[in-house]
Every structure is written in C-alpha cells, then in structure tokens.
Amino acid sequence: MAPLFILTETAAGLVLFKADKKLLKKDDVASEIETAEGINGLLKLKQFQKFDSAATALEEVASLVEGKVSPMLAKLLDTLKDEKKASLAVADPKLGQAINKLPGLTLTPISDSKTNDIFRGIRDHLPSLIPGLLPEHISTMSLGLSHSLSRHKLKFSPDKVDTMIVQAISLLDDLDKELNTYAMRVKEWYGWHFPEMGKIVNDNLAYARVILKVGMRVNTSSTDLADILPEEIEAAIKAAAEVSMGTEITEEDLDNIKLLAEQVVGFTEYRQQLSSYLSARMQAIAPNLTELVGELVGARLIAHAGSLMNLAKSPASTIQILGAEKALFRALKTKHDTPKYGLIYHASLVGQATGKNKGKIARMLAAKAAIGLRVDALSDWSAQGEGKGDDVDDEERSALGVTSRAKIERHLRGIEGKPLLPRGVAVGPNGKTTSAPGKWEVKEARKYNADADGLAGDEPAAAIPVREKKNKKLIEEVAEKSDSDSSDESDASEKKSKKGDKEAKKAEKAAKKAEKAAKKAAKAAKKAVKEAKEVKKSAVNDTPEVNGKKRKSEDDGEKSEKKKKKKNKD
C-alpha cells in the first residue's frame, strides 16, 4: 500500500509524519485522533527539521503562508524522491500546487476536509508526537512567531506604504513654510547689524552659515569664508563690511541670532533629505505616475485622495480637477464653466502649454495618469511566486509612464509648434522657464559720493535769478462774452423746442376732436335710417287698433329717445 506523508509547520520547525493511506478512507478519523494514544498509533515521526533562529522561523513561515516553497522545505522534500506513488497531505492547497511543480518529485499533494481533521489533531497533541518538546516551549515560540509574522505583514502592506508618502509631502509643505518664516526673521534680525549682506547673498542656507561663522561684523575681514561662498562673493561681503551702515548689537543679541540660524541650517538639511526620501518612495510605489506628473505633484494627488488605491479607483475627470473642489462647486452653484484643472496644473507638461491648450493637455495627462495609477496599484510586479524569476526592474515598471509621456509631448509639440523644455526645468504659467534668483549675486556696496553735493566747502549759496514777469492780456472779458453768447443761444434753442412741443400737442387734440365729431355724425345717420323704416311700417297698418298700438309704440319710442338724449348730454 502506498504510504501517506503529512507535512506540518510548527513554531519550532518543519515536521514530516508518515501514516497509512487507509487513514484517509476511514469515516471515524476525528474520533480516533482525539486522544494522544490514538494519534500516536496512527502517525509516526519521519523527520523533524528545527529552525536555527527566530529570523529563520519568520522567513520560513512567511513563505509558507504565501504558498511558496522555501529552500529549507525543498531540502526536506528531497528525502522523499525515492518514494513511489506516495501522497503528501498539506494544509494549504496553494502550497500543494507549488510543491507539485518541483522537479524530481512524484508525490501527490492532498488537501481536503479529512486532512484538516488530521492537522487539527496534530496541533492538539504535538508535544506527545515530537519527543523532547515541552508544551511551555511550544506556547512561547508560537507567541513570539505570531507577533513577528504580524509585524512582517504590516511592514509590507501597500496601504501602510501610502501613509509614508502622505505624511512626507505634508511635512515637506510645513517645512517650506517654517523655513521661509525663519529665514526672513534671520535676515531682518541680523540686517540691523549688517544690512548689506542681505543684498549680496540670496541663499538662505549660505546666509545662515555666514552668520554662524562670522558672528560680529568686525570679524568679517579676518574670517575665511571659502568653504561657504565663492571668492567674488566673499570679497564683496568683506568690502561691504568695512563701510556698513548697520548698528551695533550685544553678545546676547548675537547668541539668539545664532540659535535661529542653526535652526535654519538644520531645517534646510532635513528638508533636502526628506525630498530625496520622497522621490525614492514615489519611484518605488507609483513609478508611472511619477514619470507623468513628477514626484511632488504625484505625492500631493495621493495625499489628497487618501491613498494610492483610492486615487487609482478615481476616473480621469476626477483626477483632472482634484484639488479644485471649491471652484467646482461654486461653478455648479452659479451655473458657470467648471474648472479645467486642479493639482495637475503644476505638472511640467501642463505648464508648457499656452492658452486653451492647457485644458487639452490637462485632460490627456489625467487620462494617462488614471491608466498608470491602476497599473501601479494593482499590478503584482514580483514573479517569484510563480517560479518565473526575479523581480521586475524599475525601467520595466515605469515603461507605461515613459511611453505615455512621450505621446503627450509629441502631441503638445504639434499643437504648440515649438520644442519642449527638458524635464526638471521650472515652468511658469506662461509656458516659459522661470528664472529663479541665483544663489550668488555680486552687488557693489553704495558709498558716499561727494561730487553729488552742490557745495564743496563753506561757499555761500548762489542766489537764484529772478525771472521778469511778462504782462499778459486778460482774457476774462472774452471768456465772459463767449459764455453769455453760448448761454443765450442755448436759451433760444430751448424756447424754440418748447414752442414746437406745444404746437404738436395742440394738433393732436384737434385731431382727436375731429374723430369724435365724425363718430357722432355716423351714429345720428344710423338713427335717421331706423326712424324712416319705422314710419314706413306704420303707414302700411290701416286698422285703428293697429294705429292705436302703433301710437303707443311711437310714444314709447319718443320717451326712449328723450332718455337717450339725456344720457348723451350727461
């Protein structure tokens, strides 16, 4: 009968048991392994390979959890190469598939419900199955290994790595604000003592280092500043110190200024270190996004979204306006045009575009960034688990970002009709390079110019020649005449316009009266026609009764006519 081997991992090492294959065909396996005597009768210890240290135990167990075959496990399984038609019971089906791919092994991995019952019994009665292993030692080693394994999982969690980028970019922004404030305070404070140095040295770090090395202004000529400044700058500072117009300060003032200068130097060095750290982390976590928009813009996008996965789930339209939420909601509320870009506006490709092309390039860049983000967040770059080789190199990981950036640059070059600037060059809003002020700028100190004075000594001041006044004719009378004429003309024109308005109103009233008279004449003609018709009808009727009735109707008609006339008069 073919044997059955059972592979078990413990906190102390890897264990290989041997049993009869009929064990899997029994229906009451769980009841037989409930006691230590029963499980010892079914299983025999084949081999026990201990872990050398806690680090080795963590490495081996971590590989088993991920379903990988470690070198130590491969060495243990080499002892079973001579076994024919044997089976190997494992707890993880993924691990069984990895073992089945090993060359030279004819074992058949098994993982089902019955093997789970066997592993449960082994864990319960492990001290009785392995001689020399105490229960206290097993519990202590299991506790330490579980803590180490938990730390290992948290350390390599991609969600936790995003936190490093979010905190780093936030700290970088805070450092920039603090450095700007401290550097301005140092220049204003030390400027009372040596104001000319602020115009010569523009770099904040060099300014603070000069203060720490020189101290009082009188020590400038005897201090060597070659390790901080170039020769021409050093010479300019020493020349300006000799004729400086600054006030004197005490040693206590200088001590406080030096303490602040030390803060500027320390923060500047830490800021450089943090910037390099952020660039390295962005290249490792989101290489395609970094190639498209840069380290700082990419880090701000991740920080604004909360994590790399949240940003990868966002569509391109959201990535395009991320950071401009206030402007978006204000535009929707007022029914105006929505913004075209948010944080992505600071990318170099968008900065090189001009006018309406900025919106087009921002839309293209957001679309490519959305694809690159999904590749960065969801791709499994490591191929070791599949047995295909080592990790993918950085160039292959960022290949999508490089090709996408080249496509956008080609499109931008076509619509702009000009060559693009190389990467790393600061670009202003107009698409041109922003010429930052140089670190070293030589400016001559201003000296007193005696030639500019009007008097060289005690010479009396020259009298200013008085110019003769020319008699000019008065033009007041002419102005008055012209004013009166113009006023008379304006009055006459106003009177004429008023007369014309009155005549027009009179003509309108006469026309209205004529219309009313015509209407009255038409009504009178209609009445006369009606009366003539009534007279004809009365002449036709000859009977007295009819004449009497007709008479009454005529009297009634006369009364009605009188009433109508009264109404018309009223």
Curated annotation (Swiss-Prot):
One Pfam family per UniProt: Nop
GO molecular function: snoRNA binding; snRNA binding
UniProt biased composition (Basic and acidic residues): 475-484, 492-518, 528-539
GO cellular component terms, semicolon-separated: box C/D methylation guide snoRNP complex; nucleolus; small-subunit processome
PROSITE patterns listed in its UniProt record: NOP
Ranges where the record places region Disordered: 451-470, 475-570
Residue stretches making up the Nop domain: 285-417
GO BP annotation list: box C/D sno(s)RNA 3'-end processing; endonucleolytic cleavage in 5'-ETS of tricistronic rRNA transcript (SSU-rRNA, 5.8S rRNA, LSU-rRNA); endonucleolytic cleavage in ITS1 to separate SSU-rRNA from 5.8S rRNA and LSU-rRNA from tricistronic rRNA transcript (SSU-rRNA, 5.8S rRNA, LSU-rRNA); endonucleolytic cleavage to generate mature 5'-end of SSU-rRNA from (SSU-rRNA, 5.8S rRNA, LSU-rRNA); protein localization to nucleolus; snoRNA guided rRNA 2'-O-methylation
Keyword annotations: Nucleus, Ribonucleoprotein, Ribosome biogenesis, rRNA processing
Entry's localization field: Nucleus, Nucleolus
Family, per entry: Belongs to the NOP5/NOP56 family.
Role this protein plays: Required for pre-18S rRNA processing. May bind microtubules.
Name of this protein: Nucleolar protein 58
Organism lineage string: Eukaryota, Fungi, Dikarya, Ascomycota, Pezizomycotina
Gene: NOP58
